[in-house]
Amino acid sequence: MPSVMEKPSAGSGILSRSRAKTAPNGGQPHSEDDSSEEEHSHDSMIRVGTNYQAVIPECKPESPARYSNKELKGMLVWSPNHCVSDAKLDKYIAMAKEKHGYNIEQALGMLLWHKHDVEKSLADLANFTPFPDEWTVEDKVLFEQAFGFHGKCFQRIQQMLPDKVIPSLVKYYYSWKKTRSRTSVMDRQARRLGGRKDKEDSDELEEGRGAVSEGEPDTGDPKREPLPSRPLNARPGPGKKEVQISQYRHHPLRTRRRPPKGMYLSPEGLTAVSGSPDLANLTLRGLDSQLISLKRQVQSMKQTNSSLRQALEGGIDPLRPPEANTKFNSRWTTDEQLLAVQAIRRYGKDFGAIAEVIGNKTLTQVKTFFVSYRRRFNLEEVLQEWEAEQDGAPAAPVPTEEARRGAPVPATALEEDDEVQITSVSTSVPRSVPPAPPPPPPPTSLSQPPPLLRPPLPTAPTLLRQPPPLQQGRFLQPRLAPNQPPPPLIRPALAASRHSARPGPQPPPTLVGAPLEPPAPSL
């Protein structure tokens, strides 16, 4: 066969080559023509046989095992679709980035997972924590330390940063490398000062060595080695770095590396980590789980803050009570008149505030009421009291709880109050007024309502309500406490007697709104 016949020639060719190479060394003669012929025959040979054929595997049909043995291919992250517009896509990416911390690739992957349904993707963003692609301060410090130890060996750097992939490490390396050349003026000054200080220390060390060598020339000591002499014309080059490193050999504290700010090393932790090889991995896993839980808390806090921010943007309009659609009515009821007098006593001529207190009256209607009922309710005196309070006059003392509950008031205070009331009435009220029967004692369990509040309505209807008994005057009514204001709706006898035209007995004062009775015929 040709293959069998050609193989010895190939071997002889190889042997001839080796002989030709070893011939000059061994002194054996050789011929250049023979070697060229052998090389030509070796190159032109036909390579036939199993040694020169490729191994073709048998054909296998389609089966799941065929694809299981292959390497894991890349996963499709994003595929554009015409159903999602560019503006809508940009809005979705911005919302995913601001509210949930997703980057563009993660947000598009979520959108592709939900088949380009933006609403479902937005609802599902909060259910997942995005892979942390940001570099924290600890990650940056660890990267710098790992780069100082291992250089550009990113596989070893990844062992110190297991949550970072190698492409992310390479990307951060080049961005970090650009910032290394940027030094501020303060950094330059610090370097200069540090270089000067190191130079002074090295000079001091050299002087100390020279003094020792001059004072104690121990030439016979076998332990002491002579210092290597340096040539005078040494060029500054790679050896300069070695000189800088060697000058710190007598200062071990300067060569000691300290952990960055915020990180510390404890002997107990180092002992525990170096005790067993698995304990270090377990410790790192615990720290990773703790870091992941903290990041989840941060993400939940961000979501809570965003929801609260959305609630604040809505305003407080939904929380306001519904305003009742009050219809303005020009008719004044008894309760509204009472409330208006109390409001005048409280606000004076601030008719806008009085209209807001009443509720169903306009500013013009309140002004008309003040002009029309000025004499009827003696509003001038009410205004004088309000002006006296505004000028700084001492206000009436508020009755204590004991007086409200019906505690006995000292008799001297009541007698003085009654004397003042009688003298004030006697100077103004005519003598023709018949004496009124003593009023009934006030109930001890009841107390007057606070100002600007409507009095409680009786259980009976308004039409069937009976008027209260007639009273002689507000000055003769006993009070629970001194200087307590009188009821505002009782028509004063002073105003009635002053404005009455005909002499004779005058009718007693009546309540506002009560039906007027004709005077009894005089005998």
UniProtKB/Swiss-Prot annotation:
UniProt biased composition (Basic and acidic residues): 30-43
Family named by the database record: Belongs to the CoREST family.
SUPFAM superfamilies in alphabetical order: Homeodomain-like
All residue ranges annotated as the ELM2 domain in the record: 44-129
SMART domains membership: ELM2, SANT
Sequence position, cross-link Glycyl lysine isopeptide (Lys-Gly) (interchain with G-Cter in SUMO2): 88
Name of a matching Pfam family: ELM2
Keywords on record: Coiled coil, Isopeptide bond, Methylation, Nucleus, Phosphoprotein, Repeat, Repressor, Transcription, Transcription regulation, Ubl conjugation
Annotated stretches, region: Disordered: 1-43, 185-244, 387-523
Compositional bias per record (Low complexity), positions renumbered to this chain: 460-482
Function, in words: May act as a component of a corepressor complex that represses transcription.
Biological processes annotated in GO: negative regulation of DNA-templated transcription
Residues modified to Phosphoserine: 31, 35-36, 63, 202
Coiled coil: 283-314
Ranges for domain SANT: 130-181, 327-378
Biased composition (Pro residues): 432-459, 504-523
GO molecular function, one term: enzyme binding
Annotated positions of the Asymmetric dimethylarginine modification: 479
Cell location: Nucleus
Name this protein carries in UniProt: REST corepressor 2
One GO cellular component, as annotated: nucleus
Tissue-specific expression: Predominantly, but not exclusively, expressed in neural tissue. Strongly expressed in neural domains of the developing brain of the developing mouse CNS.
InterPro entries reported for this sequence: ELM2_dom, Homeodomain-like_sf, REST_helical, SANT/Myb, SANT_dom, Trans_reg/Corepressor
